[in-house]
Amino acid sequence: MRTFPELSRRRFLLGASSLALFAGLAPVRNARAAPKLDGYPFTLGVASGDPWPDGFVIWTRLAPKPLHEHGGMPMLAVPVKWQVAEDERFGKIVQSGEHLARPELGHSVHVEVSGLKPSRPYWYRFFVEGGEASAIGTVRTAPRASDTPGRLRIAVAGCQAYFHGWFDAYRHISEEPGLDVLFHYGDYIYEGSEAAARKSGYQIRDASGDVVERLHHGDELYTLDDYRRRYAQYKSDADLQAAHASVAFIASFDDHEVDNDWNGIWDQDRTPPELFALRRFHAMQAWYENSPVRRTQFPRADGGTAYFRRLDYGNLLRMHVLDTRSYRSNQICPNPKALAKCRFEQGKDSSILGPAQEAWLHSGLDAGKRWNLIAQQVWVMPLQGREPEGGLHGPYEDKWDGFPDSRRRLIQGISDRKLTNVVIATGDAHMNAVAEVPLRDDERDGPAVATEFLATSISSNGDGAVDSPSVRRFSQADNPFLKLIDNLRGYHTYDITATEWRTDIKVMDQVQRKGGRLSTRASFIVEPHAPKLHRA
């Protein structure tokens, strides 16, 4: 069992000196005897993440009153007991322990469980003094490095604006049979205010059709307490809790966990970097506190945290989880409204990943694995859209489009290694898109080097449609590599074997009214010897 470590003086100064930036913390008195809590403490559910062959992370956060100050918790460290069992009735408990939920970390609990068997399910739960128990979650360990699992099943989801619709898609995810893991590509929360949510005009209805308020609580997010409260609001959703309890999440982040379209040290308003760094640090601390991730993801004040990481599933799949926000070169056109006036001249040193992450990715692409999955946030495919007056729009600067040399290095690196098994998982754009990524941007119908599946949003942009102006602008004449595009809501599932990769595009009939139904819009097959898409 691994829990959050005691911090050395050096690490405190370099990394956890970040605690000096925490907002509004009073001095804390350690308490091994649990204080009386003002209500049921596990209102935010449970979660698991980042499975390895011998274990995984289990998570909860104590918040008897989620939207109150400090989640309704006293400013004390509270002991939380945890158990991991081989059966859902907890007849055979194989690991257990106690962890202090500390106010410095929003009373979150991250336990890194180890010493377990590979390729099998486990169940977990938490307790506080007095016997109050959490919900029960389930999670599977990964296979051993030398194993070839017969099948691996992955869901891909993200972009869940609370005020745009219900999270019914997560209820359907919780009912998906045999999921091994879910990759969350980001935009888990949105940073805007209640006033902005109200102004957006999305009309939300309950299952009976009555209009209800589903708005953000509070102002735009800047402080640690702001971000903590917003996560508490989102995590109070029962459908999201059900998904977390049913499958391990591989958590990443995009822009709205901090601020729209931020990149590196800049936000879109060009706030002085030293001030934006405070906001970003608060946001990333809250992301850590509310995500089932390992302690290596704990944010450091010196910016030294590497959020990118790699997970292997035997010799069947290597998953490269990227961070396409933290290390970006400065965007040339930070204001999208001025894009047409910008000269698009990215230098050879521009990067969406930064030099260290880019080198790490290229060195880790493995021909020895049957499949390589690049799990990231923004589209790689060179999409071109038409303006209403007919001219081509572009580049889409917030995507890999905005870093063409970085994209060329990625695509050329795949080609040079003669890899034919690279699949790219993408989100962010609130639409479904399926593509064969071409080797050259100027040969758009030329040979492909990878396939890309852009998964739509859970709720962002509301109900959506198969056809809409937002996707109609991407024609197949301009984008011959594009095999499907729509503006529906939902998620993707991957069924992966040694001989075949199948992606199912799962879509909702509605999200603005409670009770949306799920269907499969389309299915695609990829074979590991060629980056070609075939309709199933």
Provide a role label for each language-model segment.
Residues R2-G24, A34-A536:
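Metal-dependent phosphoester/phosphodiester hydrolase catalytic core
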Residues R29-R32:
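Sec/Tat signal peptide C-region and signal peptidase I cleavage site
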